[in-house]
């Protein structure tokens, strides 16, 4: 058997023989040794994939990070605020290495406009995250917002955008009014007309869910829901924790996915199964009502009855639309309103301004009409609340489908982008006194303000993202916030019940959450003198 020396060494290479009978290449090694060798190569390859960072050639500044984990542990419990502070050193756009993924972080309105608007056709897709896409959603649909760009995603977004545009949302106003008044009724009863403090979470969560249910399924949960409300609220919150880009180190260090006791994957799989169970139940019950001719007009019901829509959308795509509708309200509207009622309780001067506007329009204190947003101060309050308590501190991540150049830095296709909407919403150049609650900023129609808007992409707030993958539910969410604020300030004087923190930065329950919400607190809602309570007392 011939042997050859390794170049530059005195060692001999293993014998290389081709076995013509078996067709196997054998390095003078036994079969068991070969198995071990192959396994070692596989593990080494996997390890290298886990520990080597993404494309370090991107010519952008940023923190260096640590071996294997990158900057994971440096980011702390509030990634958005870490990025905002880091931008002071590295600039509005910088890169950060998290595990084996290199992320480009965008921290200012100007930079966001350039990347997400001017390069919008490239930054149109979503990156894949193992725990959410590969485990939790393994046997079910992705939401529209978490789907990579494709013809299927395009069709789903088109269907959702049509169902959630301004005219469509206007047609949902009877539903929004009904659910907002129902929330007022529950607050009135549970708080014993202001004698008892209430924790506001469930009122706005139920309002959000019932609005979504009526709009999407044509039904609402009553007093008895067999635990459906609690199950959906809990599971959607758990799913959101998995969906967050901050959720799991195994999304950035693949080797961790193979640890024998993988609690993250086990929990994610269970949330996925629980979610699939109630989503299937909602769909099948609607399908039954449609077949029996007992359905109410709704988004999914209309799809099921429309032959052309059924041809364009598969069951999985319809499931994706339904899932997006159910989860979106809890993620956005509910958490925004929870913070807002807590803020109003501590700021009676803001309540007085809203109530003065109501009195100017309705001197007899009759029930306000909310079909048009003519209460301009309260309308501005809704926008300001979504800006200052920005629930999505880091928007759903993007990935570019083609190379993008920013300030001479070429960012290759497939790179992950984070839009730091928290930093954008408290940007001092766009928003004067950014940490103050000033609804008046959205009432300024001056030419100078319009110039600032145009320079920064014409986006009023970054609460719903920006560019071609901006949340299509923005009109519905803002209309819900506006309507609820009108009725809350019409019916109640709101006051704190005990001391609590309501600062938008420090009051959050979990700064790493996908959709942040305030730490628990109580408020008292006392009926205002002279206001007719019959619209809520009569609600059954």
UniProtKB/Swiss-Prot annotation:
Tell me which cofactor or cofactors this protein depends on.
heme
Q: Knockout consequence?
A: Does not affect the itaconic acid production. Abolishes completely the production of 2-hydroxyparaconate.
Residues that, per the record, bind heme: 471
**Membrane topology per record:** Single-pass membrane protein
Where does this polypeptide localize?
Answer: Membrane
Which residues span the membrane? 26-46
Which pathway, metabolic or otherwise, does it act in? Answer: Secondary metabolite biosynthesis
Protein origin, superkingdom:
Eukaryota
Could you tell me the EC number(s) of this protein? Answer: 1.-.-.-
In which family does this protein belong, per the annotation? Belongs to the cytochrome P450 family.
Chain's role: Cytochrome P450 monooxygenase; part of the gene cluster that mediates the biosynthesis of itaconic acid and 2-hydroxyparaconate. Cis-aconitate is secreted by the mitochondrial tricarboxylate transporter MTT1. In the cytosol cis-aconitate is converted into trans-aconitate via isomerization by the aconitate-delta-isomerase ADI1. Decarboxylation of trans-aconitate by the trans-aconitate decarboxylase TAD1 then leads then to the production of itaconic acid.
| Protein name as annotated | Cytochrome P450 monooxygenase CYP3
To which species is this protein native? Answer: Mycosarcoma maydis
């Amino acid at each position: 058997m011939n042997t050859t020396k390794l170049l530059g060494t005195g060692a001999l290479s293993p014998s290389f023989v081709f076995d013509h009978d078996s067709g196997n290449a054998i390095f003078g090694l036994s079969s068991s040794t070969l198995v071990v060798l192959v396994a070692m190569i596989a593990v080494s390859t996997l390890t290298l994939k886990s520990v080597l960072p993404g494309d370090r050639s991107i010519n952008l500044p940023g923190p260096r990070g640590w071996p294997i984990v990158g900057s994971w542990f440096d980011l702390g419990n509030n990634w958005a605020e870490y990025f905002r502070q880091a931008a002071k050193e590295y600039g509005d756009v910088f890169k950060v290495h998290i595990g084996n993924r290199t992320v480009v972080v965008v921290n200012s309105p100007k930079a966001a406009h350039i990347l997400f608007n001017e390069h919008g056709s490239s930054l149109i897709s979503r990156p894949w995250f193992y725990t959410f896409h590969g485990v939790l959603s393994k046997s079910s649909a992705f939401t529209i917002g978490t789907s990579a760009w494709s013809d299927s995603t395009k069709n789903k977004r088109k269907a959702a955008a049509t169902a959630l545009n301004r005219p469509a949302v206007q047609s949902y106003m009877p539903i929004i009014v009904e659910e907002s008044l129902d929330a007022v009724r529950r607050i009135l009863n549970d708080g014993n007309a202001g004698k008892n403090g209430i924790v506001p979470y469930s009122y706005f969560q139920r309002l959000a869910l019932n609005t979504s249910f009526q709009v999407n399924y044509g039904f609402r949960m009553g007093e008895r829901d067999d635990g459906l409300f609690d199950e959906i609220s809990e599971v959607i919150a758990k799913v959101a924790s998995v969906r967050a880009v901050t959720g799991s180190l195994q999304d950035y260090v693949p080797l961790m996915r193979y640890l024998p006791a993988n609690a993250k994957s086990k929990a994610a799989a269970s949330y996925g199964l629980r979610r699939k169970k109630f989503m299937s139940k909602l769909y099948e019950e609607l399908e039954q009502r449609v077949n029996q001719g007992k359905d109410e007009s709704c988004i999914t019901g209309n799809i099921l009855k429309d032959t052309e829509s059924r041809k364009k959308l598969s069951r999985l795509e319809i499931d994706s639309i339904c899932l997006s509708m159910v989860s979106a309200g809890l993620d956005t509207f509910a958490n925004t309103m929870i913070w807002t009622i807590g803020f109003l309780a501590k700021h009676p001067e803001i309540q007085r301004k809203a109530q003065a506007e109501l009195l100017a329009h309705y001197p007899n204190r009759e029930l306000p009409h909310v079909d048009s947003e003519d209460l301009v101060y309260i309308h501005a309050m809704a926008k300001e609340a979504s800006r200052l308590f920005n629930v999505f501190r880091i928007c759903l991540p993007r990935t570019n489908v083609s190379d993008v150049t920013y300030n001479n830095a070429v960012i290759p296709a497939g790179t992950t982008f984070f839009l730091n909407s928290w930093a954008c919403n408290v940007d001092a150049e766009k928003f004067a006194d950014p940490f103050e609650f000033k609804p008046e900023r959205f009432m300024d129609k001056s030419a100078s303000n319009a110039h600032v808007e145009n320079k920064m992409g014409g986006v009023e707030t970054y609460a719903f993202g920006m560019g071609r993958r901006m949340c299509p539910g923005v009109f519905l969410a803002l209309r819900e916030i506006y309507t609820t604020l009108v009725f809350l300030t019409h019916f109640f004087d709101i006051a704190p019940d005990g001391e609590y923190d309501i600062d938008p930065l420090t009051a959050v329950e979990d700064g790493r959450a996908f959709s942040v919400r305030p730490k628990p607190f109580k408020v008292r809602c006392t009926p205002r003198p002279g206001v007719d309570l019959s619209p809520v007392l009569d609600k059954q």
